[in-house]
Amino acid sequence: MKKTILLLSVLLAMIAWYPLLVITGWIQKFTVTVQCPLAAYFVLTLAFSLISLYLMCLKEKTVNAVTTILSGLLVPFSVANLFTWVWENRTFWFLLLALVWVVFSALLMYIYGKHAFFQGAMMGGSAVVLFLVVLLCLLLVFFSIGRITIVQTLPSPEGTYYAQVIDDNQGALGGNTLVEVYDTRKKIDLFFLSIQKDPQRVYWGRWGEFQNMKLEWESEQVLVINGRAYEVD
């Protein structure tokens, strides 16, 4: 029984840490960046799948209130996991890998969930949300809605800041050219990810301007964009 609860807890931690961290970042104004995100997500997906298969193949399965709660939480967090990974990376492979998490989570809840009503309510609600999330993710991946591309990065003379020119492509809605400045002092590097305070947006222009944009640092705290100076806080 302890092994089952422990492994379900490990799976819940694996599936919940990224959505919770990213959503907290949206609220608290910091950015989470995973190094080699596709490789990292593939390894996490493989580990999640192997642990799930082990739990599914156990001959004597422990089913109680704790396993019901833990397995039930896997399903909504798997949907949140899908949305945040695809939203932050916007490629088909992330959508495909995220669906693996959803499938295994649903199977584990079916096996280790104790109450039929709880199972039905959780599965029904999650299915509706999953449909909407997958639809949104397909639009993001295949129709370039909200696709953001960094076209230029320029560090300040002393390396305290770096400016990025961004092509914010909104598809049929047009888009924008953005210039954002990051403070390298407000960054935490961890094992395979980094956490950094959101940048200061110093310029917001028309889509396509980045193609002819001239960017240079006049001093450590003054950035010149197309001949106009912008002071960095």
What is each model feature region?
Residues 28-45, 61-113:
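Membrane-embedded alpha-helical segments of integral membrane proteins
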Residues 116-145:
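Internal/C-terminal transmembrane anchor helices
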Residues 14-22, 71-83, 130-135:
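Aromatic-anchored segments of alpha-helical transmembrane domains
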Residues 8-12, 42-45, 68-72, 123-131:
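Hydrophobic H-region at the start of alpha-helical membrane spans
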Residues 2, 54-67, 111-122:
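Membrane-interface helix-boundary motifs at transmembrane edges
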Residues 142-163:
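Alpha-helical transmembrane signal-anchor/signal-peptide segments
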Residues 1-56:
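Membrane-anchoring hydrophobic segments
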